[in-house]
Amino acid sequence: MGKISSLPTQLFKCCFCDFLKQVKMPVTSSSHLFYLALCLLAFTSSATAGPETLCGAELVDALQFVCGDRGFYFNKPTGYGSSSRRAPQTGIVDECCFRSCDLRRLEMYCAPLKPTKSARSVRAQRHTDMPKAQKEVHLKNTSRGSAGNKNYRM
């Protein structure tokens, strides 16, 4: 994963803007052509560069950027009932610090999204999540018979 504002990228932006300013002028000198060639070389070298390694704070910052509010794991989450005899687990440091990794690799370490509750489900939850004592009282009151303002338990 490349850095967002790398030196070759900044150099290309600067060179490209300067070149556009110079194009309006009909006179082109060899220094202008050399400057343009240098810019193109910087652009192609940054475009063909492989993914970089991320370690320490840079790795944590990249994970926070990619995962956002979900959070992230340093080891890949495993399923339930995984065997203790399994092979040693590799983590994000092994994959992105000791070797280079890309954006997809970083996303594999993001925590899953937590489902959000809608307003309707919250209202339904209020009714169904009454404390047990209140439910019992409510059930007792509804099970009473009514015979002329006298309440009898059935």
From Swiss-Prot:
Bridged cysteine pairs (disulfide): C55-C97, C67-C110, C96-C101
GO cellular component, one term: extracellular space
Region of interest (B), residue spans: 50-78
Region (C) residue spans: 79-90
Prodomain residues: 120-154
Region of interest: A: 91-111
Segments for region (D): 112-119
Amino acid composition bias (Polar residues), ranges on this chain: 140-154
Main location: secreted
The UniProt record lists the keyword Thylakoid: no
Biased composition regions of type Basic and acidic residues, renumbered to the chain: 126-139
A single MF term (Gene Ontology): hormone activity
Kinase recorded as keyword: no
BP terms from Gene Ontology: cell population proliferation; insulin-like growth factor receptor signaling pathway; negative regulation of apoptotic process; negative regulation of release of cytochrome c from mitochondria; negative regulation of smooth muscle cell apoptotic process; positive regulation of cell population proliferation; positive regulation of D-glucose import; positive regulation of glycogen biosynthetic process
Location of this chain's protein in the cell: Secreted
Entry keyword set: Disulfide bond, Growth factor, Secreted, Signal
Cross-referenced Gene3D superfamilies: Insulin-like
Expression sites (tissue/organ): Expressed in all tissues examined: brain, lung, liver, spleen, uterus, ovary, testis, heart and skeletal muscle.
Function: The insulin-like growth factors, isolated from plasma, are structurally and functionally related to insulin but have a much higher growth-promoting activity. May be a physiological regulator of [1-14C]-2-deoxy-D-glucose (2DG) transport and glycogen synthesis in osteoblasts. Stimulates glucose transport in bone-derived osteoblastic (PyMS) cells and is effective at much lower concentrations than insulin, not only regarding glycogen and DNA synthesis but also with regard to enhancing glucose uptake. May play a role in synapse maturation.
Family (UniProt): Belongs to the insulin family.
Subunit-structure text: Forms a ternary complex with IGFR1 and ITGAV:ITGB3. Forms a ternary complex with IGFR1 and ITGA6:ITGB4. Forms a ternary complex with IGFBP3 and ALS.
PANTHER family cross-referenced by the UniProt entry: INSULIN-LIKE GROWTH FACTOR I (PTHR46845:SF1)
Protein name: Insulin-like growth factor 1
Organism per entry: Capra hircus
